[in-house]
Every structure is written in C-alpha cells, then in structure tokens.
C-alpha cells in the first residue's frame, strides 16, 4: 500500500490528492514519466482512508487503480491492503486448467443474495458435482447495482454489492480449501459507458479506435506503454495478490494492437514469469471468434503463448444438432457432419466459407496442438444470455437431449465448461440485465439488443427490458430444482459423466468418429470408452463390448444386442 498515492496523468498540468474524512487537498508532484505523487508518504494514521484526485480542477475522481469503491464508481475510492488478509491456502499448489472441468458462474445470480459470501455456501455442491475450477464472470466495479460485469470501469476494484475485495479473498480461499481452482474473467478490450473517468487522467483510450462495445484501449498509440502496464499489472493483481489461478480474457479479437509485440504475447510472457515466482501454474484462456491458432501457439513458434481458447464451433455444432435450430450463425452447423469435423479437427470453420459472416473464416488448428487447449461447452453466459429471451437449452429440449449434449462435451477431447445450473437442467432463464442509472443509456441498450436479434431471426417483441428489475430477478438460479425430479436425475448423470471423464487420458483424441444423419446418431471412442449419442426419438443400437458403464435413457437388451431409446446417451467400456 503506497501512501504517496501515485497516479499516472501525463497530460495534466496539476493533480491534487483529496484524502481523508475531512477531504484534505494535497498537491502532488510530477515525475518525468507522467506519474504524480506526494513527495513524502502521507501520515494520516493506520486507518484505511478514502481518497481520489482532482485533475486540472476537475473531479474528484477515483484512482484508476482503486482496489475498493464502497460507494460506487463516481465516488472516492478507499485504501485496501490485500496483504492484510490471513490466507489459509498455503498448501494450495494450483493445477493446469487445460483438460480440467470448468464451471462458469455469475456472482449476482448464482444465489438469491448475489454475493461472494453466499456463493461460498454453494461450493460443496460443485465439489460433489466433481468440477475442478470455478470461472467467475467479471467482478470489477461498474456503475449500477447489477449487470453481467462486462461494462466495468475500475478494473482493480471488486464490485461492492458482491462484497468487495475482502469477500473475494474469502471466496478464493474457500475454493482452494475444497480443491477448486479459480478463473477470473477480465475485460481488457473496452471500458463501460457509464462512470469511466480514466480519460480524465490520460490517453487510456485509442484515438478513433472502437469496437462493438465502445472505445478500444490505447495499446499502440502515443503514451500507450503505461496503458499496457495498467492491463498487465491488473492481471498480476488477480493472480498474485488475490490468488486466482487463471484469467479468461474477454473477446481478445477486439483488442486493437498493431505493435510487433502484441499485448497478448507480452501478457503471456509476464504470467509465465509470475508462475515461476509463485511456484504454481497459472492459466490464460482467451475468448476469441477468430479460429486462429496463433493465440495458443507457443512463443517459440511465433505465437502468443496463451494456454487455451474458447471454441464456439463446438457449441454451435452441439446446439444445432441437439435443438435443431439453424438460424443465424447456426446455419452452417445443422448436420452431424459439423460434429464430426469439430471432434476430428477442433474447429468447423478453419478457412471455410461462413454463411453468417459472408466470407471465409478461420484457419486450421496446428496438428501439434492438443484439443484440451480448446474450451468447449453446450451452454455459456453468452450463448444463453444473448438469446432473445435468455432461454436455456432446457427450454427447447427434454432431459434426454440435455444428457446427450452433456456426454458430447464432458467426454469429448476438449476442456469442458458448464454454465451454472446446466448440470440439473435449470428452467430459470439467464437474461441480459442492466442497472444503468442514466435512463437514456438504459434505453439505448434496449434498442441495441433489439437490433442485434433481428439478424438471428428472433422476434424483437419478446426481448425483455434489460433495465427492468424483474429481468434480473428472473435470472437467479432456483436451488430447489436439483432436489426434485427430473432435475435430480440429470444432476446425477452429470456427476457420473465427470467421474467417468477422470478415467480418460487428458490428451486422448476422439477415435472412430461416426455419424448416422438419417437416424440422428453420433458416436466416438476415447480411451477405454465408446460413447453413443442418440439425438432423436427411437431405438439406437449400442455396441456391448466390455459392458454398459453409464446411460441416460432406457437401455434394453435384445437378441441383436443393446438398444438405447433416444434421445439420450450410452457409454460402454471397450474390451
């Protein structure tokens, strides 16, 4: 904790510290790199104090590196010393998260209370399920009380309604005590539209550089060295000071960086260095829609050296074949051939024509890159929440089809990820919700959602108002569901699938991948198992081999062998 209160404001003529209960105003001194600070540490006693800055008479604004915002992003921040927490995870050695089972959750809707402390009380459910890691949607501070978290404006501060930074430390500690790793979702491609005062301090945003969500960060323009340092230091903060085990990097395709050394490569090198310093593995997972192996190619082979990246193509192939939905970006994925290709080659679009994009897309995955470096899922926050009404797959198909999707993801060759509630077939939607204090911003957000859905062929009239508190309320999990059927049976199947997955060598490829389009049957072998998935009603033959290990759906023995009544899944052990 630095009580000289340094802040970067390279273009300011004057910066004044506003500090303490009496809001004393103390002038700061500038160094040659544009950093302002007190010449001597402030001696205001041991208590943590509120502080902010006047920049050329404007403000006061919160510190861009503020670690706590107890009264919101427009107010003064409060000192926070992460070293004061008495960690109990000295025995935690971390784990390689490629090949692990990841569970994605949103703090605000995971429990009725919507806090990190209340989430701790549900961690034992995840342990019984058998997952290896919890991935938290962004927890950085944003304007308003509730939202998805992707409009953060103070990236170092934990959103106060979730419990603030101390609650975050308690959550990570509780996860590690149960053998669960923690992946933190971070957003470095834009800043939120409300409460963003970073441009008042300096050129954090790129000139004329914008993406889907707003102004892009200044990664390659004048004075961009400190902007990049701001991002890399933030990653280090979550991993070192808050003990996270990995980061999910949001929409890296939206990063605008023309430097020879790309930010992602620089970040990966620093995180590798940090892993050596900490003596535990750290994982960087990119979200990217580029289907570009450069992200996860080694730096020695002129890649960025990230550990894994999301694979939307697996989702699209699973979703289209399980639900039969082929509108919008699902159009190319409607046949079982799409499933065959992603199981054999990792991506469907690897230089092929994309009808949704109306151009060729992607490039082939390097043959030496194992599929565990691709994160696959049947549902996630984007693919559920960005539907017109935020309906889960459970609103479109029955439990047998949900079980089929689960078998594809959890026993496939990828790193599997589940979305909270998926494991019991939650019937609660997960919708897009916001709490922008500015009415005009809320209205603009709603209009943007309606325009976005038009291209997918969904009825804009049914899109819920993101600003309506009922939209947020509907999106909370119902924890009574897994205690009753049919949810309890599906939960047991997920649990058994995850246990079965542990028998498989992590890099075992999918072999003998077969598909029968007419009958809606997809099958593959991995390790000692043969997986048969029936996507349509009716009996499907299942090879007996060494005997049935697990099934969802009735399996009958007859003269011709085993038959599974679809939809469902059956797994047998190979002789």
UniProtKB/Swiss-Prot annotation:
The keyword Cytoplasm applies. It comes from the Bacteria. One of its GO terms (molecular function) is 4-alpha-D-(1->4)-alpha-D-glucanotrehalose trehalohydrolase activity. Gene3D superfamilies: E-set domains of sugar-utilizing enzymes (1.10.10.760), Glycosidases (3.20.20.80), Immunoglobulins (2.60.40.10). GO terms for biological process: trehalose biosynthetic process. It catalyses: hydrolysis of (1->4)-alpha-D-glucosidic linkage in 4-alpha-D-[(1->4)-alpha-D-glucanosyl]n trehalose to yield trehalose and (1->4)-alpha-D-glucan. Keywords: Carbohydrate metabolism, Cytoplasm, Glycosidase, Hydrolase. Its EC number is 3.2.1.141. Its main location: cytoplasm. The active site is at 250 (nucleophile), 287 (proton donor). GO terms for cellular component: cytoplasm. Transmembrane segments: none annotated. It is an enzyme of class 3 (hydrolase). SUPFAM superfamilies: (Trans)glycosidases (SSF51445), E set domains (SSF81296). The record marks 382 as: Transition state stabilizer. Substrate binds at residues 248-253, 312-316, 381-386. Pfam families: Alpha-amylase (PF00128). Pathway: Glycan biosynthesis; trehalose biosynthesis. The keyword Membrane does not apply. It is found in: Cytoplasm. Belongs to the glycosyl hydrolase 13 family. This is Malto-oligosyltrehalose trehalohydrolase.
């Amino acid at each position: 904790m630095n009580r000289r209160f340094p802040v970067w404001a390279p273009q300011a003529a004057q910066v004044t510290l506003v500090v303490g209960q009496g809001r004393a105003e103390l002038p700061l001194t500038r160094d040659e790199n544009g950093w302002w600070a007190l010449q001597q540490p402030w001696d205001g006693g041991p208590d943590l104090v509120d502080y902010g800055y006047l920049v050329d008479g404007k403000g006061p604004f919160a510190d861009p590196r503020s670690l706590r915002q107890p009264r919101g992003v427009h107010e003064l921040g409060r000192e926070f010393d992460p070293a004061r927490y008495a960690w109990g995870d000295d025995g935690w050695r971390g784990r390689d998260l490629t090949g692990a089972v990841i569970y994605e959750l949103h703090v605000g809707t995971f429990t009725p209370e919507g806090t990190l402390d209340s989430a701790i009380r549900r961690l034992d459910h995840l342990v019984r399920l058998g997952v290896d890691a919890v991935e938290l949607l962004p927890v950085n501070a944003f304007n308003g009380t509730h939202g998805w978290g992707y409009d953060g404006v103070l990236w170092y501060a934990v959103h106060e309604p979730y419990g603030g930074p101390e609650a975050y430390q308690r959550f990570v500690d509780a996860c590690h005590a149960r053998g669960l790793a923690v992946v933190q979702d971070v957003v470095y491609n834009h800043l939120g539209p409300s409460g963003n005062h970073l441009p008042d301090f300096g050129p954090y945003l790129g000139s004329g550089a914008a993406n889907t969500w707003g102004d892009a960060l200044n990664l390659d323009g004048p004075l961009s060295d400190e902007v990049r340092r701001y991002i890399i230091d933030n990653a280090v903060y979550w991993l070192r000071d808050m003990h996270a085990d990995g980061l999910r990097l949001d929409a890296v395709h939206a990063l605008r960086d023309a430097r020879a050394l790309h930010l992602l490569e620089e970040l990966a090198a620093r995180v590798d260095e940090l892993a050596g310093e900490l003596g535990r593995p750290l994982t960087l997972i990119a979200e990217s829609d580029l289907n570009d192996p450069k992200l996860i190619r080694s730096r020695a082979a002129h890649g960025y050296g990230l550990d894994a990246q999301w694979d939307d193509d697996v989702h699209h192939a699973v979703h289209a074949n399980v639900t039969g939905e082929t509108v919008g970006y699902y159009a190319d994925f409607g046949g079982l051939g799409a499933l065959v290709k992603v199981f054999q080659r990792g991506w469907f679009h690897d230089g092929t024509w994309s009808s949704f994009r109306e151009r060729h897309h992607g490039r082939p995955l390097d043959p030496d890159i194992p599929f565990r470096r691709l994160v696959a899922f049947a549902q996630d926050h984007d693919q559920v929440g960005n539907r017109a009404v935020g309906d889960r797959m459970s609103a479109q198909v029955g439990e047998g089809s949900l079980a089929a999707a689960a078998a594809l993801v959890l026993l496939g060759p990828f790193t599997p990820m589940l979305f909270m509630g998926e494991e019991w077939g939650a019937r609660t939607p997960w919708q897009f919700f916001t709490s922008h204090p500015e009415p005009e911003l809320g209205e603009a957000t709603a209009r943007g959602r309606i325009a976005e859905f038009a291209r997918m062929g969904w009825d804009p009239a049914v899109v819920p108002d993101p600003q309506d508190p009922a939209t947020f309320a509907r999106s909370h999990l119902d924890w009574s569901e897994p205690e009753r059927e049919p949810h309890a049976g599906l939960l047991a199947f997920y649990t058994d699938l995850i246990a079965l997955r542990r028998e498989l060598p992590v890099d075992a490829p999918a072999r003998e991948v077969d598909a029968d389009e007419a009958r809606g049957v997809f099958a593959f072998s991995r390790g000692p198992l043969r997986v048969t998935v029936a996507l349509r009603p009716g009996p499907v033959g299942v090879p007996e081999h060494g005997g049935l290990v697990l099934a969802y759906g009735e399996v009958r023995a007859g003269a011709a062998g085993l038959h599974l009544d679809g939809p469902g899944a059956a797994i047998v052990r190979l002789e």
